[in-house]
Protein backbone atom coordinates (compact mmCIF):
# COMPACT_ATOMS: atom_id res chain seq x y z
CA UNK A 1 0.00 0.00 0.00
CA UNK A 2 2.82 2.32 0.97
CA UNK A 3 4.60 1.61 -2.34
CA UNK A 4 1.41 2.48 -4.25
CA UNK A 5 1.09 5.81 -2.41
CA UNK A 6 4.74 6.65 -3.11
CA UNK A 7 4.33 5.72 -6.79
CA UNK A 8 1.21 7.86 -7.12
CA UNK A 9 2.91 10.84 -5.49
CA UNK A 10 5.93 10.42 -7.76
CA UNK A 11 3.74 10.42 -10.88
CA UNK A 12 1.91 13.55 -9.71
CA UNK A 13 5.21 15.29 -8.94
CA UNK A 14 6.62 14.53 -12.38
CA UNK A 15 3.41 15.71 -14.04
CA UNK A 16 3.71 19.05 -12.27
CA UNK A 17 7.43 19.40 -13.04
CA UNK A 18 7.09 18.70 -16.75
CA UNK A 19 3.80 20.49 -17.33
CA UNK A 20 4.13 23.69 -19.40
CA UNK A 21 3.44 26.98 -17.67
CA UNK A 22 0.57 27.62 -20.10
CA UNK A 23 -1.02 24.30 -19.30
CA UNK A 24 -0.60 24.86 -15.57
CA UNK A 25 -2.17 28.28 -15.77
CA UNK A 26 -4.83 27.17 -18.22
CA UNK A 27 -3.73 29.86 -20.68
CA UNK A 28 -5.42 29.79 -24.09
CA UNK A 29 -2.89 30.67 -26.79
CA UNK A 30 -4.16 32.03 -30.11
CA UNK A 31 -2.26 33.12 -33.22
CA UNK A 32 -3.34 36.27 -35.10
CA UNK A 33 -2.02 36.82 -38.65
CA UNK A 34 -1.95 40.11 -40.53
CA UNK A 35 -0.45 41.04 -43.90
CA UNK A 36 0.82 44.66 -43.80
CA UNK A 37 3.77 45.99 -41.77
CA UNK A 38 3.39 46.54 -38.03
CA UNK A 39 3.00 50.37 -38.10
CA UNK A 40 -0.05 50.26 -40.41
CA UNK A 41 -3.61 50.65 -39.17
CA UNK A 42 -4.71 46.98 -39.61
CA UNK A 43 -1.85 45.98 -37.31
CA UNK A 44 -2.40 48.84 -34.87
CA UNK A 45 -5.99 47.67 -34.40
CA UNK A 46 -4.73 44.08 -34.07
CA UNK A 47 -2.45 45.03 -31.19
CA UNK A 48 -5.21 47.03 -29.52
CA UNK A 49 -7.61 44.05 -29.77
CA UNK A 50 -4.93 41.74 -28.36
CA UNK A 51 -4.43 43.99 -25.33
CA UNK A 52 -8.16 44.32 -24.70
CA UNK A 53 -8.84 40.57 -24.95
CA UNK A 54 -5.93 39.67 -22.68
CA UNK A 55 -6.98 42.32 -20.16
CA UNK A 56 -10.69 41.53 -20.19
CA UNK A 57 -10.10 37.79 -19.81
CA UNK A 58 -7.75 38.40 -16.89
CA UNK A 59 -4.83 36.83 -18.72
CA UNK A 60 -6.79 33.70 -19.54
CA UNK A 61 -6.10 34.29 -23.25
CA UNK A 62 -2.71 35.02 -24.83
CA UNK A 63 -2.66 36.38 -28.38
CA UNK A 64 0.51 35.97 -30.45
CA UNK A 65 0.46 38.45 -33.34
CA UNK A 66 2.18 38.01 -36.71
CA UNK A 67 2.27 41.24 -38.80
CA UNK A 68 3.87 41.78 -42.19
CA UNK A 69 2.74 38.52 -43.80
CA UNK A 70 5.03 36.48 -41.56
CA UNK A 71 2.33 33.84 -41.09
CA UNK A 72 -0.17 34.45 -43.89
CA UNK A 73 -0.29 36.84 -46.85
CA UNK A 74 -3.18 39.07 -47.89
CA UNK A 75 -4.65 36.77 -50.53
CA UNK A 76 -4.10 33.61 -48.46
CA UNK A 77 -5.55 35.01 -45.25
CA UNK A 78 -9.15 33.82 -45.28
CA UNK A 79 -8.41 30.33 -46.60
CA UNK A 80 -5.43 30.07 -44.25
CA UNK A 81 -7.59 30.86 -41.23
CA UNK A 82 -10.24 28.38 -42.37
CA UNK A 83 -7.51 25.72 -42.72
CA UNK A 84 -6.18 26.44 -39.23
CA UNK A 85 -2.83 27.92 -40.27
CA UNK A 86 -3.73 30.80 -37.96
CA UNK A 87 -6.48 31.04 -35.37
CA UNK A 88 -7.31 34.62 -36.35
CA UNK A 89 -6.58 36.69 -39.44
CA UNK A 90 -7.19 40.13 -40.89
CA UNK A 91 -7.37 41.03 -44.57
CA UNK A 92 -9.16 43.22 -47.08
CA UNK A 93 -12.12 41.76 -48.93
CA UNK A 94 -11.22 43.98 -51.89
CA UNK A 95 -8.60 41.40 -52.89
CA UNK A 96 -11.39 38.90 -53.61
CA UNK A 97 -14.36 40.86 -54.99
CA UNK A 98 -16.00 37.81 -56.53
CA UNK A 99 -15.94 35.95 -53.23
CA UNK A 100 -17.19 38.67 -50.87
CA UNK A 101 -19.86 40.18 -53.09
CA UNK A 102 -22.21 41.43 -50.37
CA UNK A 103 -19.66 43.12 -48.13
CA UNK A 104 -17.75 44.52 -51.12
CA UNK A 105 -20.87 46.54 -51.90
CA UNK A 106 -19.42 48.98 -49.37
CA UNK A 107 -16.51 49.56 -51.76
CA UNK A 108 -18.83 50.89 -54.46
CA UNK A 109 -19.03 54.69 -54.91
CA UNK A 110 -21.79 55.05 -52.31
CA UNK A 111 -20.61 58.18 -50.53
CA UNK A 112 -18.91 56.88 -47.38
CA UNK A 113 -17.56 60.10 -45.79
CA UNK A 114 -15.08 58.66 -43.29
CA UNK A 115 -13.74 55.41 -41.85
CA UNK A 116 -15.89 55.42 -38.71
CA UNK A 117 -19.08 55.67 -40.75
CA UNK A 118 -17.82 53.12 -43.25
CA UNK A 119 -16.80 50.65 -40.54
CA UNK A 120 -20.16 50.69 -38.77
CA UNK A 121 -22.08 50.60 -42.06
CA UNK A 122 -20.03 47.59 -43.22
CA UNK A 123 -20.68 45.77 -39.96
CA UNK A 124 -24.41 46.50 -40.27
CA UNK A 125 -24.36 45.12 -43.80
CA UNK A 126 -22.69 41.91 -42.65
CA UNK A 127 -25.06 41.45 -39.72
CA UNK A 128 -28.12 41.98 -41.90
CA UNK A 129 -27.21 39.52 -44.66
CA UNK A 130 -24.76 37.08 -43.00
CA UNK A 131 -23.12 36.23 -46.36
CA UNK A 132 -22.39 32.60 -47.14
CA UNK A 133 -18.75 33.52 -47.78
CA UNK A 134 -18.30 33.94 -44.00
CA UNK A 135 -20.26 30.85 -42.93
CA UNK A 136 -17.12 28.87 -42.06
CA UNK A 137 -15.45 31.70 -40.15
CA UNK A 138 -16.29 33.69 -37.03
CA UNK A 139 -16.28 37.44 -37.67
CA UNK A 140 -14.58 39.38 -34.86
CA UNK A 141 -14.55 42.86 -36.42
CA UNK A 142 -15.12 44.71 -39.68
CA UNK A 143 -13.88 48.12 -40.68
CA UNK A 144 -13.00 50.23 -43.68
CA UNK A 145 -10.32 52.63 -44.72
CA UNK A 146 -11.06 56.31 -45.10
CA UNK A 147 -12.16 57.40 -48.61
CA UNK A 148 -9.50 56.95 -51.29
CA UNK A 149 -7.48 59.62 -53.06
CA UNK A 150 -4.89 59.51 -55.83
CA UNK A 151 -1.24 59.58 -54.76
CA UNK A 152 1.06 59.99 -57.74
CA UNK A 153 4.54 60.85 -58.99
CA UNK A 154 3.05 63.22 -61.57
CA UNK A 155 0.34 65.84 -61.01
CA UNK A 156 -3.17 64.70 -61.93
CA UNK A 157 -5.50 67.69 -62.17
CA UNK A 158 -7.96 66.54 -64.83
CA UNK A 159 -9.29 63.31 -66.31
CA UNK A 160 -7.02 64.00 -69.28
CA UNK A 161 -4.01 63.76 -66.95
CA UNK A 162 -5.04 60.36 -65.56
CA UNK A 163 -5.70 58.69 -68.91
CA UNK A 164 -3.50 55.61 -69.36
CA UNK A 165 -1.52 56.17 -66.15
CA UNK A 166 -0.54 52.96 -64.33
CA UNK A 167 -2.00 53.22 -60.83
CA UNK A 168 -2.29 50.57 -58.13
CA UNK A 169 -5.83 49.69 -57.11
CA UNK A 170 -7.69 46.55 -56.01
CA UNK A 171 -11.36 45.61 -55.98
CA UNK A 172 -13.66 48.62 -56.10
CA UNK A 173 -10.71 51.01 -56.39
CA UNK A 174 -9.56 49.26 -59.57
CA UNK A 175 -13.01 49.75 -61.10
CA UNK A 176 -12.94 53.43 -60.15
CA UNK A 177 -9.54 53.91 -61.78
CA UNK A 178 -10.69 52.18 -64.96
CA UNK A 179 -13.80 54.38 -65.10
CA UNK A 180 -11.57 57.45 -64.96
CA UNK A 181 -9.41 56.15 -67.80
CA UNK A 182 -6.37 55.07 -65.79
CA UNK A 183 -4.72 51.68 -66.13
CA UNK A 184 -5.42 49.88 -62.81
CA UNK A 185 -2.69 47.53 -61.59
CA UNK A 186 -3.78 45.04 -58.93
CA UNK A 187 -1.39 44.08 -56.14
CA UNK A 188 -1.38 43.82 -52.33
CA UNK A 189 -0.48 47.08 -50.60
CA UNK A 190 2.83 45.75 -49.19
CA UNK A 191 4.06 45.20 -52.77
CA UNK A 192 3.29 48.78 -53.81
CA UNK A 193 6.41 50.59 -52.47
CA UNK A 194 8.70 48.42 -54.61
CA UNK A 195 6.38 48.81 -57.60
CA UNK A 196 6.64 52.59 -57.23
CA UNK A 197 10.42 52.44 -56.91
CA UNK A 198 10.77 50.28 -60.03
CA UNK A 199 8.31 52.35 -62.05
CA UNK A 200 5.78 49.52 -62.41
CA UNK A 201 3.15 52.02 -61.24
CA UNK A 202 3.18 55.80 -61.06
CA UNK A 203 0.87 56.01 -58.09
CA UNK A 204 -2.12 54.49 -56.39
CA UNK A 205 -5.69 55.06 -55.25
CA UNK A 206 -6.03 54.49 -51.54
CA UNK A 207 -6.61 56.17 -48.20
CA UNK A 208 -4.06 58.76 -47.17
CA UNK A 209 -2.68 57.20 -43.99
CA UNK A 210 -0.48 55.20 -46.38
CA UNK A 211 1.43 58.37 -47.25
CA UNK A 212 3.05 58.06 -43.84
CA UNK A 213 2.70 54.37 -42.95
CA UNK A 214 4.17 53.15 -46.24
CA UNK A 215 6.23 56.32 -46.80
CA UNK A 216 4.51 56.92 -50.15
CA UNK A 217 5.08 60.65 -49.63
CA UNK A 218 8.76 60.05 -50.43
CA UNK A 219 7.84 59.10 -54.02
CA UNK A 220 4.33 60.48 -54.54
CA UNK A 221 4.63 64.26 -54.25
CA UNK A 222 1.10 64.86 -55.57
CA UNK A 223 -2.29 63.94 -54.10
CA UNK A 224 -5.52 64.46 -56.03
CA UNK A 225 -8.41 64.71 -53.57
CA UNK A 226 -11.15 62.51 -55.02
CA UNK A 227 -12.61 61.16 -51.74
CA UNK A 228 -14.12 58.10 -53.34
CA UNK A 229 -14.16 54.33 -52.70
CA UNK A 230 -12.98 52.63 -49.51
CA UNK A 231 -11.28 49.30 -48.83
CA UNK A 232 -13.32 46.93 -46.59
CA UNK A 233 -11.54 44.71 -44.04
CA UNK A 234 -12.60 41.76 -41.90
CA UNK A 235 -11.07 40.08 -38.87
CA UNK A 236 -12.06 36.42 -38.80
CA UNK A 237 -11.42 33.39 -36.62
CA UNK A 238 -11.15 29.69 -37.40
CA UNK A 239 -14.48 28.13 -36.46
CA UNK A 240 -12.94 25.19 -34.59
CA UNK A 241 -10.77 27.58 -32.59
CA UNK A 242 -13.83 29.67 -31.81
CA UNK A 243 -15.95 26.71 -30.75
CA UNK A 244 -13.15 25.52 -28.45
CA UNK A 245 -13.21 28.76 -26.44
CA UNK A 246 -15.00 28.89 -23.07
CA UNK A 247 -18.26 30.82 -23.06
CA UNK A 248 -16.83 33.67 -20.98
CA UNK A 249 -14.01 34.22 -23.49
CA UNK A 250 -16.47 34.12 -26.39
CA UNK A 251 -18.52 36.78 -24.61
CA UNK A 252 -15.50 39.05 -24.28
CA UNK A 253 -14.80 38.76 -28.01
CA UNK A 254 -18.44 39.19 -28.99
CA UNK A 255 -18.72 42.28 -26.80
CA UNK A 256 -15.71 43.74 -28.62
CA UNK A 257 -17.05 43.39 -32.18
CA UNK A 258 -18.84 46.73 -32.51
CA UNK A 259 -16.41 48.52 -30.19
CA UNK A 260 -13.35 47.35 -32.11
CA UNK A 261 -14.87 48.15 -35.49
CA UNK A 262 -15.75 51.70 -34.43
CA UNK A 263 -12.41 52.21 -32.63
CA UNK A 264 -10.54 51.26 -35.79
CA UNK A 265 -12.59 53.66 -37.91
CA UNK A 266 -11.94 56.52 -35.50
CA UNK A 267 -8.24 55.70 -35.35
CA UNK A 268 -8.06 55.68 -39.14
CA UNK A 269 -9.78 59.06 -39.47
CA UNK A 270 -7.45 60.65 -36.94
CA UNK A 271 -4.39 59.03 -38.49
CA UNK A 272 -5.30 60.29 -41.97
CA UNK A 273 -5.29 63.88 -40.69
CA UNK A 274 -1.88 63.33 -39.11
CA UNK A 275 -0.56 61.74 -42.30
CA UNK A 276 -1.69 64.67 -44.45
CA UNK A 277 -0.02 67.17 -42.13
CA UNK A 278 3.16 65.06 -42.02
CA UNK A 279 3.28 64.74 -45.83
CA UNK A 280 2.97 68.49 -46.32
CA UNK A 281 5.56 69.34 -43.69
CA UNK A 282 8.11 66.61 -44.44
CA UNK A 283 7.93 66.33 -48.24
CA UNK A 284 6.01 69.43 -49.30
CA UNK A 285 3.42 67.22 -51.00
CA UNK A 286 0.96 69.16 -53.16
CA UNK A 287 -2.70 68.39 -52.47
CA UNK A 288 -4.84 69.06 -55.53
CA UNK A 289 -8.49 69.89 -54.84
CA UNK A 290 -11.04 69.39 -57.60
CA UNK A 291 -13.52 72.24 -57.95
CA UNK A 292 -17.24 71.49 -57.73
CA UNK A 293 -17.67 71.14 -61.49
CA UNK A 294 -14.64 68.89 -61.88
CA UNK A 295 -15.67 66.69 -58.92
CA UNK A 296 -19.16 66.23 -60.38
CA UNK A 297 -17.61 65.29 -63.73
CA UNK A 298 -15.31 62.71 -62.11
CA UNK A 299 -18.15 61.26 -60.02
CA UNK A 300 -20.42 61.01 -63.06
CA UNK A 301 -17.98 58.57 -64.62
CA UNK A 302 -18.54 56.17 -61.71
CA UNK A 303 -22.29 55.56 -62.14
CA UNK A 304 -21.86 52.45 -64.36
CA UNK A 305 -19.84 50.72 -61.61
CA UNK A 306 -22.85 50.31 -59.32
CA UNK A 307 -25.06 49.37 -62.28
CA UNK A 308 -22.65 46.60 -63.25
CA UNK A 309 -22.42 45.37 -59.65
CA UNK A 310 -26.23 45.17 -59.45
CA UNK A 311 -26.33 43.21 -62.71
CA UNK A 312 -23.63 40.74 -61.61
CA UNK A 313 -24.95 40.28 -58.07
CA UNK A 314 -28.50 39.75 -59.32
CA UNK A 315 -27.23 37.10 -61.74
CA UNK A 316 -25.80 35.26 -58.72
CA UNK A 317 -29.19 35.25 -57.02
CA UNK A 318 -28.53 38.09 -54.59
CA UNK A 319 -31.02 40.90 -53.82
CA UNK A 320 -28.59 43.41 -55.28
CA UNK A 321 -30.70 46.57 -55.27
CA UNK A 322 -31.84 45.87 -51.71
CA UNK A 323 -28.23 45.35 -50.61
CA UNK A 324 -27.15 48.62 -52.19
CA UNK A 325 -30.05 50.44 -50.55
CA UNK A 326 -29.07 48.86 -47.22
CA UNK A 327 -25.51 50.16 -47.57
CA UNK A 328 -26.73 53.69 -48.24
CA UNK A 329 -29.20 53.52 -45.34
CA UNK A 330 -26.45 52.32 -42.98
CA UNK A 331 -24.20 55.18 -44.10
CA UNK A 332 -26.95 57.70 -43.40
CA UNK A 333 -27.58 56.08 -40.01
CA UNK A 334 -23.98 56.36 -38.83
CA UNK A 335 -23.00 59.74 -40.33
Predicted features, each with a name:
Residues 1-10:
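Bacterial N-terminal signal peptides that target proteins for export
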Residues 122:
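P-loop NTP-binding core
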Residues 26-117, 125, 129-335:
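N-terminal secretory/targeting leader peptides
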Residues 15-23:
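C-terminal segment of classical bacterial N-terminal signal peptides
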Residues 1, 25-26:
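Absolute protein N-terminus
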